[in-house]
Regions:
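N-terminal secretory signal peptides and thylakoid transit peptides that target proteins
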Residues: 1-15
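C-terminal segment of N-terminal export signals and the immediately downstream linker at the start
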Residues: 21-57
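Low-complexity, Pro/Ser/Thr- and charge-rich linker/hinge segments at domain boundaries
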Residues: 34-36, 153-178, 283-286
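N-terminal edge beta-strand
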Residues: 47-74, 167-194
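Structural beta-strand segments of beta-rich domains
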Residues: 75-79, 196-200
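Aromatic sugar-binding surface patches on proteins
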Residues: 112-119, 241-252
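Short acidic/polar inter-strand loop motif in beta-rich domains
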Residues: 137-144, 266-275
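Short amphipathic, basic-aromatic surface patches that mediate peripheral association
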Residues: 203-217
Length: 286
């Protein structure tokens, strides 16, 4: 009997010691290697640290990213980003989980001058991946949305058409643009709800080389700025290698900008980009 009691006391001590020495149970966030990512992407924790740092982050349905379910042309994947329900937007950052070059562009709309928080463009996709937009508001919070795009891939590691035929140098830096009316002003908010909205669609001729195709160094537009007739900046865009060749960008405004607009920019080789568009709207866009 005494031996049995001694054994039981010993077992009780060992159990208590093991319990005291074991770590506390992990929280749900700690146990999830994707950091709570809606796409369950293992790249997300690293992406958050790389692009968003230690700032607070929310997965927010008000940040809408639209793209094809399957991209037939991996060198020209259309993406539209809008954050109509958010106020006080400072920056929109677009990045791709599984691209060899993850950052696509940074967009800075001047909301106080009627520029809406929306942008459309095309980019190169290397393989199926979540495509994300992170929207920073004045309170320092990043609001994140995204969409999953499937693709056969390879868009980042092949040369563009104008690079293949050598025609890129003949049109380098040429700008064409039109301003169209829109019947609805998405996200007009304080900028003027119910106003006649407009969309600016512009193209800049440039090969936008990623540097990942054999023998072709990185060569891409890195900055564009649109200014009104008074020289005030309406928007600024920092582009990176994944943006498609001869990029086309679309920007929305709560009201048609008056007078002549001026586009200025540079590429990573220091070439200057300049172009003008009249404030008069032309035609119509759906």
């Amino acid at each position: 009997m005494y031996r049995r009691a001694a054994v039981l006391r010993t077992l009780s001590f060992l159990v208590a010691t093991a319990t005291l020495g074991s770590p506390p149970p992990a929280s749900a966030a700690e146990a999830d290697p994707t950091g709570g990512d809606p796409f369950r992407s293992f790249q997300w924790p690293d992406l958050r640290r790389e692009f968003l740092g230690t700032a607070p982050v929310e997965f927010d349905p008000r940040v809408k990213v639209s793209g094809p379910v399957f991209a037939e042309d991996a060198m020209n994947v259309p993406i539209s980003v809008s954050a109509d329900g958010l106020q006080g937007i400072e920056q929109i950052l677009v990045f791709v989980d599984r691209n060899p070059i993850r950052k696509v562009l940074e967009y800075f709309p001047a909301g106080e001058r009627g520029t809406l928080p929306s942008v459309s463009f095309r980019f190169k996709l290397q393989q199926a991946s979540p495509v994300r937009a992170a929207v920073k508001t004045r309170d320092g919070v990043w609001h994140v949305g995204g969409t999953l795009v499937d693709s056969a891939g390879g868009g980042c590691t092949v040369a563009g058409e104008t690079r293949k035929d050598g025609s890129w140098s003949k049109s380098l830096g040429e700008v064409s643009a039109k301003l169209y009316p829109r019947s609805v002003a998405p996200g007009a908010g304080d900028a003027g709800a119910g106003a006649a909205a407009s969309r600016l669609r512009l193209r800049v001729m440039h090969p936008m080389d990623t540097g990942l195709a054999g023998g072709i160094p990185a060569f891409f537009i890195n900055r564009l700025s649109l200014r009104d007739a008074q020289g005030r900046e309406l928007l600024r865009l920092n582009a990176y290698e994944p943006v498609s060749e001869n990029p086309i960008f679309s920007f929305d405004f709560a009201n048609p900008p008056a007078g002549k607009l001026q586009l200025v920019g540079t590429d990573n080789n220091g070439n200057r980009i300049t172009g003008a568009v009249t404030g008069a709207v032309i035609g119509a866009v759906e």
